[in-house]
Amino acid sequence: MQLSSYTELREQLLAGSLRCEEVVRSYLERIDAAREDNIFITVFHERALERARMLDRKLAEGGTVGKLFGLPMAIKDNIAMKGERLTCASKILENYESVFDATVILRLEAEDAIFLGKTNMDEFAMGSSNENSAFGNVPNPFDKSRVPGGSSGGSAAAVAANLALVALGSDTGGSVRQPAGFCDIVGLKPTYGRISRFGLVAFASSFDQIGVLARTCGDAALVLEVMAGKDERDATSSAHQVDSYHSMMERVSPEGLKIGVPQEFFTDALNADVARLVLATLDDLRNRGAELVDITLPDSAYAIAAYYILVTAEASSNLARFDGARYGFRTSEAADLAAMYVNSRTEGFGREVKRRIMLGTYVLSAGYYDTYYKKAQQVRRYFQDQYRAALQHVDVIAGPTSPFPPFGLGDKTGDPLEMYLADVFTVPASIVGMPAVSVPLGFDSQKLPVGMHLVGNFFEEGKLLGIARMMQRA
């Protein structure tokens, strides 16, 4: 069963030519056949089938069905589902079961979505390759010697490999968009606060945002409509009006659009194939009536430095709760309480997580707080002002999702700084909190996926997805 979009699936379900149970069985069979790829950490065989049967009965009895009736979805394993494992791909939470549902889970279930399982990821969402998981690597579906991107690599691979029609991920600095670019799918990070973070395990709370990975911009818009909105359990969620993103997307046309193209993004450091595909897509839009506007974001190179100071500082605070005393892994080698804390964290956390905790603790320490953390917050505000100013004159800011195509497994694990640069084009949108999307452009000369990255103004996801949809069709 190969479905191109949820719209296609919904038509067949409502017409009776397909049943939810039939669809779910097909997906579960493919998931089981691909088990060696480590895409899923937990698969909900019985739960998914029981829900599918319930939805089939609901339709047969003439009940009103939800906006996402029968949509088979995968969930990144840092989003809470009551009664299911919540591992964050870490040894320290390997056997932890959530006692509540995330707000997004409740909202999706209320509209009749079906969850197939929890996907692999970089541990605690820290990574750009899905190589930091305690459950093993995830290969790229288009070349199994290469990475799928991260940290939502399992979710991206699930959609690309046709193991789910849509997946949820989380995006802190590019963790939805970069793997989407590496896996030839759409990856949306909404405006910060557009979707409730209640039930999302925190990495960096002022950056984290739940996002959507899908085959089409239309599917991403439908899922966003359901998840968006104020939540009393998340003080950072916004009460801004939830639009009909799918309808808004359909109304966008290239005539009169102004697309900002930062010259700083197109340097000799950018892979030649990536540059060629991005520029060809922009030229196509110009030929269809859009205006390409040269803009300058002169200090973009400093975004990565500010980002890693801020997110590691927040991570060192957020991850202090995993101490072996309250829940999760506890060491068996401890002579006293202090040793239990130290050994539980040493044994339970992976190398990259420990590296970031140490960096964060350092930048928050006495004597360095003003030099690093405070200065990085000032840089963050500077970038917010810069992007606000740019988007007063253009509709979106366009560039590559990644400076290079998917790289080989193990190629960058020995050089953390090189790995961090994989997010150089996605980090600025996270720093400023604006919505951004990666849209697939096709394949390079090595038959590897390439993505285009678009940043829009606050709460303009409908327009952003409409422009992305035109590029996907280019």
UniProtKB/Swiss-Prot annotation:
Q: Which GO terms describe its cellular component?
A: glutamyl-tRNA(Gln) amidotransferase complex
Pfam family example for this protein?
Amidase
Endpoints of the signal sequence? none
- Going by the entry's taxonomy, the superkingdom of the source organism is recorded as Bacteria
Q: Which family does it belong to?
A: Belongs to the amidase family. GatA subfamily.
Provide the function of this protein: Allows the formation of correctly charged Gln-tRNA(Gln) through the transamidation of misacylated Glu-tRNA(Gln) in organisms which lack glutaminyl-tRNA synthetase. The reaction takes place in the presence of glutamine and ATP through an activated gamma-phospho-Glu-tRNA(Gln).
Instruction: State what protein this is by name.
Output: Glutamyl-tRNA(Gln) amidotransferase subunit A
